[in-house]
Every structure is written in C-alpha cells, then in structure tokens.
Amino acid sequence: MRSKLFVPGSRPELFGKALNSHADAISIDLEDSVVTERKADARSFVSLFLQSNEVLASSKIIIVRVNGLDTPHFAGDVESVAHARLAMLNLPKVESADDILAAVAVLERAEAQAGIDTPIRLLANVESPKGLRFANEIAAAHPRVAGLQLGFIDLFEPLGIDRYDKANVHAVMLAVRMAAGAAGVFAYDGAFPDVQDVGGFRAEAAMARRLGFLGKSCIHPRQIEFANDVFTQEWDVAYASRVLSAYEEAKARGAGAFLLDGRMIDAPGVRRAQAVLAASKGTALSGE
C-alpha cells in the first residue's frame, strides 16, 4: 500500500475515478471533509459504492474513514459501511486502547448484522498528544489493528508546532514507527497539504520510507505517482529479491544467518525484504 488516495464521501462522482487511479488504495472520508448537513448523504453514497459491481470487480484496497468515537455519527457510519469489500476502517483521533476496544465492539455487531465472515481491520490515526503518548497501547490493543497512521495537522497546529519543520516531523514519525513495530503492525505516513510542492512531498515520503513506513497518504491524484515511486525503489526491490534468494540458499544449508555483499543478514532482514517486495506489488497490509 504505497499510496492511498483520499476521497470526500460527499463526492460520489469521484469514487469511480479514484478506483481507477494508480493508487494502491483509496480512502473515502466521512469525517472532516463532509459537513454535518451531508453526513447522512455521504454515508449512503459510500454504502452503495461498496456494493457496486465496479468495486466487486476491483482489487483495489478500500478504506473508509468514519467519524470519531465521540461523535453521534460513529455507530451509524460503521453500520452503513460494513461490507465485505471494505478492507479497513480508519479511526480518527484514537487516544487509547479503550477507544480501539469500543470501536471493535461496534464493528463486530455491524459485521454480524451484515453477515460478514472476514474481520474488517482497523487503521488507527495518531493525531493528538495523548494518542502519541499511548501509541504503543493503541497499536497492540486488538488483533484487528492493522496499522497506525499519522495526522500531522491535527497533532501540530493546536500546539503551535511547525508542521513543515523536518525535525518535528521526523521525531513523531520515529515514535509512531517504533510503536507500530513493537506491536507488529505497519506505520503509514499522513497527508502533505501543499499539493503544488512536489519536492516537499517527495522529501517527506522519502523520510517516511527510510523509517520503514509502508506508504503515504495522497490528497490529490497528482501525488500518487510520487508516492508510488518513492516507496518502490528499484534498487530496494532488486536487493530484497537477492536477500530472499540468499536466504533460501542459507536455509537449505541449515543456516539462520548469512552474508550478502559483506553484510550479515538474519531474520529481521529477511522480514524486511519480504515487506519491500509485498509493498512493491501494492499488496502489503502489514509493515512487518
């Protein structure tokens, strides 16, 4: 999931275009991009889209960001979008393990009502000081948690922190990546607001990639190709293939560690190579 294109839930005319884009995933939003008066309409639009033939025929990863647990819209959102083709439910402003457990309870009821057998996973947004503080607990709260996603604007702006300062961004990225890594789930980079600043987008995506993030959110179609490019580096893919080939040879010899280009590689390096190859194919939902 190198790239994930954001689509407002109140704009159904954009759903099909997003589905046919080069993004590995689409994230339809019912939260901030939809005004209160259009919440019900957006919910219906998304529900119908998830049941459409074009979605059923597509292999695109589909995510829906619902309204927060502390809003009157949450339960209705979950009940409306709980469909078999929904890969993940994106939870905004998660601040504790209890938030995850509360969301799971609502989701389980919705799945039972809809007759869904395969559990829908959760992508938890870290976008508040409290959420950042408890990121470890959030990531490990329940097996449904697939990953942690950064929300820089909600995290930084209320505190007067410069969202474009690379040191600020790096510090939060590293903390969230470590929390995700400890729980064995992926970390996903947030949106870059300036759609005209290609260099800034690429630089931030490259920073996330170096920290082991799975991919980056895109708020405009023009950002997709840059996210895909940054998170699919040919040298990395080729090297990952060599790592796995060398691993198979070492395994046949009964060795758990081996040398490649003078560098010792063991189980963590093999897992990283597997993740790189999965991400290059746009199939990964796990960063470990």
Q: What residue ranges belong to the model's regions?
A:
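Expand to "…catalyze enediolate/carbanion chemistry for C-C bond making/breaking, isomerization
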Residues: M1-E288
